[in-house]
Amino acid sequence: MMRTEYCGAVTEALLEQTITITGWIHRRRDHGGVIFLDMRDRAGILQVVVDPDTPEAFVTADAARSEYVLKITGRVRKRYEGTENANMTSGNVELLAKEIVVLAKSETPPFPLNDENISVSEDLRLKYRYLDMRRPEMQERMVFRAKATSTIRRYLDDQGFLDVETPILTRATPEGARDYLVPSRTRPGNFFALPQSPQLFKQLLMVAGFDRYYQIAKCFRDEDLRADRQPEFTQVDIETSFLSEEDIMDINEGLIQNLFKTMLDVDLGKFPRMTYAEAMRDYASDKPDLRIPLKLIDVADLMQSVDFKVFAGPANDPKGRVAALRVPNGGSLTRKQIDEYTKYVGIYGARGLAYIKVNDASNINNGVDKESGLQSPIIKNMSDEVLVSLIERTGAQDGDIIFFGADKAKIVNDAMGALRVKIGLDMNMETCEWAPLWVVDFPMFEETDDGKWTSMHHPFTMPKGSVEELKNSPETALSIAYDMVLNGTEIGGGSLRINTVEMQRAVFDALGISEEEANEKFSFLLDALKFGAPPHGGLAFGLDRLIMLMVGASSIRDVIAFPKTKTADCPLTQAPAEVDSRQLRELGIRVREKAQAENKE
């Protein structure tokens, strides 16, 4: 073998032994005629000392530069007292070089690889991703991800799950996002679709009798990208038969508990449960961040008769919401800070951010002039009775501030839910480091802007109740679905699945999917349900997102080896790119040229 030890694995256990390492020069320093090389590999960094007593090695080291690839043989010795580095596994030892071989030279990298606070553009990092991943921070994240994936596999293997691969080339299905399409050469004019998830295939595996399935699956969605989205992403996909909703949740809760204990030595404890209705009422989000103790409080009933249309309008609108957010000690917020929060909620469609500062609540309760106890431009539009009720309901104390959201319920939820978290983080209100929970009892459907129904999760989710109940009241139907949330991020979602043709057709009907369309797109599933489909359900975790949270990265791009940009481009390979016209002809495809007007634009 070319080496006997990894750089980062050399410890005092190897003192006075002769070893061989290989790796890259992370840093090179000259001190008093002695050359110090910090040698790096994926296990870490080892300090190498090269002195003039070994002339050949010294000459080689003197000519070497950062990122040269070297093979070094030498003797492990203890560092001199006072030169130890407690931040490194190898920090108590160093290697006294006897022989150095240059395995590869390197040009000067386009950005420094030994700077922890790298300040280059993400596009440049992605263009030279193979260099970016040499940085210790990226190396640690990739190693962490690999070990986490192995931990997940071991847990599921021990639980009796089978790792089964499902097709990448499949057909388009309506799952809520655009498909990536792949033209067929053998059937011109027809297209495969890359899977948005293995959903239907894992259900068919249940019909086939493989009652415990899992897969670390690549999935593809052609959608607008954000910090936590990629066009291709990795999913821990799980499906089971003959288990209840509680059984499935317990297995997957155990998976995450085991993962955090193994990788971070963190005991997450039992996950609390919260219904969708409770989450939206108290936190204005179906993925609440429970580290933040702030809650929203509905006050629409108090605002129905106030002389303030901004509040009275939504308060009397069945689709409106008026919610208050009490921030303890928020009275210290400056006008500038409040203006910044007003701009922030505007991102989510809010047209403003009303507030009341509570200076002396007793003045209101005692009937003293309200303006001496409260500070806000809106209190002149409210009676003392309303203000007293408002203070009582929110539990506001002297020195607090109360923010208000009043609009269509969706706008209020989006804006105030985001504001709740932002204020909590800005004011360091987190009560713990990790806050997992289950959100359950989701609505089966949600209404679109044009008044139609769409699936809250996907059209194969089992509803609570009978077929007749679903047909009679689709608007109130709840699903047997469950999402796992961690620190305000949905890391996994699942449900029990429909296992009868009658219920599946009833759901298709509610979604406006005709029998003809259902037969065209899902005949294979409908046929399978006729042949004894067992009760089944499952869950899928977004692996990229989960790892991002665990390592404290700001984007999933930082935990994926070769990610795409926010515009779904790959700066490294320059993908997507034009292809040879011959290939297009073989596929029966002609690329339409842009109109002249478009070109001029």
Swiss-Prot record:
GO terms for molecular function: aspartate-tRNA ligase activity; aspartate-tRNA(Asn) ligase activity; ATP binding; nucleic acid binding. Residues 199-202 are annotated as: Aspartate. One of its GO terms (biological process) is aspartyl-tRNA aminoacylation. It comes from the Bacteria. Belongs to the class-II aminoacyl-tRNA synthetase family. Type 1 subfamily. PANTHER family: ASPARTATE--TRNA LIGASE, MITOCHONDRIAL, ASPARTYL/LYSYL-TRNA SYNTHETASE. This is Aspartate--tRNA(Asp/Asn) ligase. It comes from Psychrobacter sp. (strain PRwf-1).
